[in-house]
Swiss-Prot record:
PTM summary: Phosphorylated.
Region annotated Disordered, chain positions: 274-313
Function: Component of the ribosome, a large ribonucleoprotein complex responsible for the synthesis of proteins in the cell. The small ribosomal subunit (SSU) binds messenger RNAs (mRNAs) and translates the encoded message by selecting cognate aminoacyl-transfer RNA (tRNA) molecules. The large subunit (LSU) contains the ribosomal catalytic site termed the peptidyl transferase center (PTC), which catalyzes the formation of peptide bonds, thereby polymerizing the amino acids delivered by tRNAs into a polypeptide chain.
Assigned protein family: Belongs to the universal ribosomal protein uL10 family.
Modified residues (Phosphoserine): S301
Species, as recorded: Neurospora crassa (strain ATCC 24698 / 74-OR23-1A / CBS 708.71 / DSM 1257 / FGSC 987)
InterPro entries: Ribosomal_protein_uL10, Ribosomal_uL10, Ribosomal_uL10-like_insert, Ribosomal_uL10-like_insert_sf, Ribosomal_uL10-like_sf, uL10_eukaryotes
Name under which the protein is recorded: Large ribosomal subunit protein uL10
GO biological process, one term: ribosomal large subunit assembly
UniProt-annotated location(s): Cytoplasm
GO cellular component terms listed in the entry, alphabetical order: cytosolic large ribosomal subunit
Length: 313
């Protein structure tokens, strides 16, 4: 009993220390993960993350003990079920997640195992003798005899995802040397600084977040303006619209304040605020006319000289 109590206390201390040292946790499923595979995963995460396994009852008991001081840990409790473990990290969550999921190994089908994905048998020659045709026929696999061997004529879905693999299906897959399953750690949930979320949230880019945020703000502002219900996104639009109405009323009435006087004057005397460009062009016109007159006089002078100058050569 003393040894068990010591082990329990040691596990509690280790879990508490990891919770305090690391801000993020991957809750991972380890169904069908071998000890060798677990060792390889620990090696790949060395320096970036720490893997901790433990009995669910002990983990839940420890977390409930820590909840009094840190209520956020209660969010971990619903996910401590089945064959799970914790991966603690302070690193980039997406990079650590990819390393966790990268370690996969192919595995043969076992009778009674739940298929994690659809299992297909491809069309082609099996190299098996015709005497085993009845075995294929019993499973509904379309075959024919070609060059003295059994040939599967079309691709066939043998087992659907989520279904149990039967003894006959497992035997056939092993006969064909097909290892249809891949096993490795899966990620049940991510805990980061008090929040829990699915791992696919890590694939959302900053651009997607900004676009969604902008769309939401626009929608809220539109609804608020339509319902005449002020909200933070709509207030600026409400103020602008209200100011436009005030300006319209002030222009049509004697209401006045310093800022509106210039606007009223512009409306009453538009010519006073006309651009200086037309005036400048008007001034330029006489100057151009004078230049043309001078040019014409010069040409006439040249013609006169050319007409009589030849007589004195």
């Amino acid at each position: 009993m003393g040894g068990k109590s010591a082990n329990k206390a040691g596990y509690f201390d280790k879990l508490k220390g990891l919770l305090e040292d690391y801000r993020s946790i991957f809750i991972v499923s380890v169904d069908n993960v071998s000890s060798q595979q677990m060792h390889e995963i620990r090696q790949s995460l060395r320096g970036e993350a720490v893997v901790l396994m433990g009995k669910n009852t002990m983990v839940r008991r420890a977390l409930k003990t820590f909840v009094a001081d840190t209520p956020e840990y209660e969010r971990l409790l619903p996910f401590v079920k089945g064959n799970v473990g914790f991966v603690f990290t302070n690193g980039d969550l997406k990079e650590v997640r990819d390393k966790i999921l990268a370690n996969k190994v192919a595995a043969p089908a076992r009778a009674g195992a739940i298929a994690p994905a659809d299992v297909w048998i491809p069309a082609g020659n099996t190299g098996m003798e015709p005497g085993k045709t009845s075995f294929f026929q019993a499973l509904g696999v379309p075959t024919k005899i070609a060059r003295g061997t059994i040939e599967i004529t079309t691709d066939l879905k043998l087992v659907e995802a989520g279904a149990k693999v039967g003894p006959s299906e497992a035997t056939l897959l092993n006969m064909l040397n097909i290892s249809p399953f891949t096993y490795g750690m899966g990620i049940a949930q991510v805990y980061d600084q008090g929040n829990t979320f699915p791992s696919d949230v890590l694939d959302i880019s900053e651009e997607q977040l900004l676009k969604a945020f902008s769309t939401a703000i626009t929608t809220i502002a539109s609804l608020s303006l339509a319902l005449n219900f002020p909200t933070l996104p709509s207030v600026i639009h409400s103020v602008v619209n209200a100011y436009k109405k005030v300006l319209a009323v002030a222009i049509e009435t004697e209401i006045s304040w310093p800022e509106i006087e210039e606007l009223k004057d512009r409306i009453a005397n538009p010519e006073a605020y006309a651009s200086a460009a037309p005036a400048a062009s008007t001034e330029a016109a006489p100057a151009a006319g004078k230049a043309e007159e001078k040019e014409e006089e010069k040409e006439e002078s040249d013609e006169d000289d050319g007409g009589f100058g030849g007589l004195f050569d």
